[in-house]
Amino acid sequence: DVSDCSREQLEQLLDLAFSISRDIRAFENTRTGRMLVNLFYEASTRTRVSFEAAAKRLGMHVINVSATGSSVEKGESLEDTFYTIQAMGPDCIVVRHPEEGNATRLAAIAESGVHVINAGDGTRAHPSQALLDALTLKQAFPDFSKIHGRHPDF
């Protein structure tokens, strides 16, 4: 979640995203051979496709898993699904789940080296959207201090 990051970490992340947005070709295939899994328990178009497109531009292999058509329909728990996917060796698992806190819970049980990204958990948080909104502000106002007396608080 965004709240788990320090202001410095968020600024570094936004600086990197800003650099990528200005010259995407310089970053193409910089993560070749790595794997990202989109684990989505909710219908999604923009968020899932955004993660997939970004990962593919970086040269990553992408696997999309949804609750529909998976063993979740037969009663498999979120944790069992996560452990099964984790055993396949992904570098990153992007999680979208309708229940609050599940992405954080999965991050706590993830093996070292497996990064869990919260792509939305119920009505509580949508960190990737918050970061996109912050990037949009950074692109429009490169110096946040010039936003007429308002200072975004990360």
Language model region names:
Residues 1-53:
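Positively charged, low-complexity intrinsically disordered leader regions
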